Amino acid sequence: MNKEKVLIIKPGYSETLDGEIGMITSLGDVLRSTVLLHLYKNAHVTWLVDEKAFPLLKGNPFIQKILPYDLTSVLQLQSERFDTVINLEKVAGLCAFSDSIHAWRRYGFRFDPENGVALAYDGSQHVLEICMDNEYKKKSGKYWEEVLFEMVGAKWRGEGCILGYKPKSGVNYDIGFNYDVGKKWPNKAWPMEYWKELERIIGNKYTVTWQSGLGNIEEYIEWINSCRVFITNDSLGLHIASTLNKKVIALFGPTIDSEIYLPDGVKLLPKTHYDCKPCIVSSCIQERSCMYNIEPEDVYDAIENISKKEI
């Protein structure tokens, strides 16, 4: 019996549950999308991805073919036939490309030929509403994975991401400082002076390692795996650490913490009365970012609590 042929289109140019579209590849969004592979473990899966995110998918046992998003791959896929196409990108050109693929079933986003914009296939309209209406998004109260499963007509039961690369490093440090947030959302960063103050408070009680391996995803994964407890902004490292079953302390400000499923972690939010938080935008309108209202002492207390059984 032939396996179901599934094409997943997720280069990472638009975050699935965010209205913003750009050409900065969202590596975290690509990794989080792998939760769908739990539904297609017995299928033949092809994944179209930006080359920057390729290392996140490489070696994944549930992806039979990984293709870089380029003209050659587009022409190849337009000549193939699939049972199911899942388009998780809202880029208009990718939606038009997705519609051109020969397939029996389609999920996610499609192209509106009248207006030249992305629309949703039946069953995904509420996802488009979440993307385009920040107030609706704040009130949704659903985990990102839950919404993704709903897009394909399935029920999420706590499944997590599936990382292809298997780290070889052991645990060498008590605590990892994951301070970088990348270029897309600079205001998600906890102030550097707070990281340094936290290190001072910790002193010699725990061994601390600062973020490394940023230029190579596999090295980055190895570094994360070397940490027992992981302190992080809302970034790629958060999702990798959760996938590796690390004890995570996640610092949230401008983004929605309730979207993030963190079974082995703690979420810390700013102690502030700003009406704008979470603003869900990449630049802050305040004189002082809300991230300044997560105190190093509070993070240290979280370390103590989460470390009682771990260190």
Regions from the language model: what does each represent?
Residues M1-I311:
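Catalytic machinery of carbohydrate-active enzymes
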